[in-house]
Amino acid sequence: MNNMKSTFLFLLTTTMMTCTAYGQSSNHKENKLPDWAFGGFERPKNVNPVISPIENTKFYCPLTKDSIAWESNDTFNPAATLYNGEIVVLYRAEDKSGVGIGHRTSRLGYATSTDGTHFQREKTPVFYPDNDSQKELEWPGGCEDPRIAVTDDGLYVMMYTQWNRHVPRLAVATSRNLKDWTKHGPAFAKAFDGKFFNLGCKSGSILTEVVKGKQVIKKVNGKYFMYRSEEHTSELQSPMFIS
């Protein structure tokens, strides 16, 4: 289990190197980080990228009502966590419905690993735009850039970007098994009477701490704490992590 935890921390720090747009570096340098940070990691040789685009995995899209090669163009910007003794990665995958980042549709794929370098992937996405309450905010751009943290009782909280090709919005979803998700909508929909609803925002990371060897969501003065960015990085607090 210690090896599993070490591998998981490596994955979080290196962001998995799944984006095929970046090459491997031949220089192996130790990260020099503050005492509070996870450090001392090296990029392994001859294993990257660990998740690459696949042309022949098909998914029936409920919005286009057609079979889509949903991960044929890009696989990148993943989140990694632990579930039932395995590393689970949710990765952003793009189809070929457009040209250029932001002009295709993104969905989230699911992959598992016991060693952090060899992955088994599900053939269909586990999170995607659907005929649901979030369709207007997620279609046609999709669901992007997951960030996952877990509570001490095992509830996984995912911050992700809703992209309707007009405004990127940071949104929240929760799950107990990382496959069946409940969408809660934009994170700031209710803040200050909706003042920030149309403000572009993404890349939300919830503050965590290590408790008895497990990385869990932490409260600060009775509130949840999150960093987010879009042009600028800012700090946010909330008594509830779903709004």
Can you describe what each PLM-predicted range is?
Residues Q24-N77, T81-G141, A149-S238, S243:
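Beta-rich carbohydrate-recognition and catalytic domains
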Residues M1-N27:
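Bacterial Sec-dependent N-terminal signal peptides
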